[in-house]
Amino acid sequence: MDVPARVSRRAAAAAARMLLRTARVPRECWFLPTALLCAYGFFANLRPSEPFLTPYLLGPDKNLTERQVYNEIYPVWTYSYLLLLFPVFLATDYLRYKPVILLQGLSLIVTWFMLLYAQGLLAIQFLEFFYGIATATEIAYYSYIYTVVDLGMYQKVTSYCRSATLVGFTVGSVLGQILVSVVGWSLFSLNVISLTCVSVAFAVAWFLPMPQKSLFFHHIPSSCHGVNGLKVQNGGIVTDTPAANHLPGWEDIESKIPLNLDEPPVEEPEEPKPDRLRVFRVLWNDFLMCYSSRPLLCWSVWWALSTCGYFQVVNYAQGLWEKVMPSQNADIYNGGVEAVSTLLGASAVFAVGYIKLSWSTWGEMTLFLCSLLIAAAVYVMDTVQSIWVCYASYVVFRIIYMVLITIATFQIAANLSMERYALVFGVNTFIALALQTLLTLIVVDARGLGLCITTQFLIYASYFAAISVVFLANGIVSIIKKCRKQEDPSSSPQASTS
């Protein structure tokens, strides 16, 4: 009588080991990778010197001219980001995230080391290239956590990881402002602190667990799932009983596994090698399917167009502030403005969750109105020669964009699997960067028009105004079509009775 009991316990233990290899136990396994990733995100974004980058480059430390900074150095970041985005997107999935996160940390270290010690135009252009690598590899940070936690934890861990970057950026901005305005530290000292923080982030990244799967190239084979497990689209496992029932001592496993003493132990199948051609074929089919949806296409178009303009305004806002009030002649509050705009934007984003609106009906009109407000904010920032008006307009600009991009993200992600959401996110960002590259090449780059900073912002305001006109026309057409559809059912009975 003891033998079956021992065999039963061995079978239960073997099943438990198999589940531990192929599944993720949300209550026990999610905390460590989430905490490590949040720590990485916090320190990687804790960069007190970033709001003061333009004054630092124009100041005595680097002694560069405005034309060199705006028209020859900053465009390198845009070109690098675009060039690297798609290869990094695929490499992130193929290498399973952690190596790319380490690459991001290393790129940040190189960027801030060069910011401290590199001199000359060419060296700073190389610096911008490494910063482009760091920006392109951000996708690994935001995707990693979905491969090491249970599906039911996605919402919670997403909020934790995004909050970590938000808090890190805000703390860095406030710290930089205090050290400059109150303590009187030099901008060089702020870069030393930034280098230290990104080095800490790089060290933390080494302790991240290596994921066993990814969205596209490294799916968990379905034969490994066992115990009533079904493979879902993101490679995780869904069982027909609650996950909590399996946790305490794995008691539930023993009753679900048929025992056969004559059968040898079952060997776990090896993970199949990724079929690259199949992956690209699936990506292409998903691309066609996703963008054939009119609502998704509408939100994606706004995402790409507005993100292009947002990047341009944020990248060159410090240059406009420097023009309105040179940092050599007065105190500057760039760090405080970045912190305030981030906090108010986060508060507004939180409030979005409580908005009750039929986005299918009024979404395009909302995009029109908010794009028009963004255009007005950028125009005021450019034309009113007051630094405080510039600061206030910038805060309004960032709040509106953060709210709308949150709504767009939700509208796009609501009915997509994780793979398709990652694909749409990557495609939208790539289109935004392609447009930004074109805009930079024509308006900013010294090889193009090489316009002054105030003329650039006038063009950006006109750009957002054009976006608002597009969505106004599209919104009117959509509302008219919807009204006609609502009238058709009521008119058909009248026609039949007559």
Swiss-Prot record:
Q: Which organism is it from?
A: Mus musculus
Q: Which GO terms describe its biological process?
A: cell differentiation; pyridoxine transport; spermatogenesis; thiamine diphosphate biosynthetic process; thiamine transmembrane transport; thiamine transport
User: According to its UniProt record, which protein family does this protein belong to?
Assistant: Belongs to the reduced folate carrier (RFC) transporter (TC 2.A.48) family.
Q: Which residues carry this modification: Phosphoserine?
A: 222
Q: What InterPro entries does the entry give?
A: Folate_carrier, MFS_trans_sf, ThTr-1
Induction profile: Induced in a TP53/p53-dependent manner upon DNA damage.
Which intervals lie on the Extracellular side per UniProt? 47-71, 127-128, 186, 317-334, 382-386, 445-456
Domain of life of the organism in this record?
A: Eukaryota
> What biological function has been recorded for the protein in this entry?
High-affinity transporter for the intake of thiamine. Essential for spermatogenesis. Mediates H(+)-dependent pyridoxine transport.
Q: What is this protein called?
A: Thiamine transporter 1
Q: In this chain, where does the modification N-acetylmethionine occur?
A: 1
Provide GO CC annotations from the record: plasma membrane
Consequences of knocking out this gene: Males are infertile with reduced testis size and aspermia. Spermatogenesis fails at the pachytene spermatid stage with apoptosis of germ cells. When fed on a thiamine-free diet, animals develop additional phenotypes including diabetes mellitus, profound hearing loss, and defective hematopoiesis. Pancreatic morphology appears to be normal although insulin secretion is significantly impaired. Erythroid precursors in the bone marrow are almost completely absent leading to loss of reticulocytes in the peripheral blood.
The topology of this chain with respect to the membrane is: Multi-pass membrane protein
Q: Keyword Cell membrane: yes or no?
A: yes
* Transmembrane residue ranges: 29-46, 72-92, 106-126, 129-149, 165-185, 187-207, 296-316, 335-355, 361-381, 387-407, 424-444, 457-477
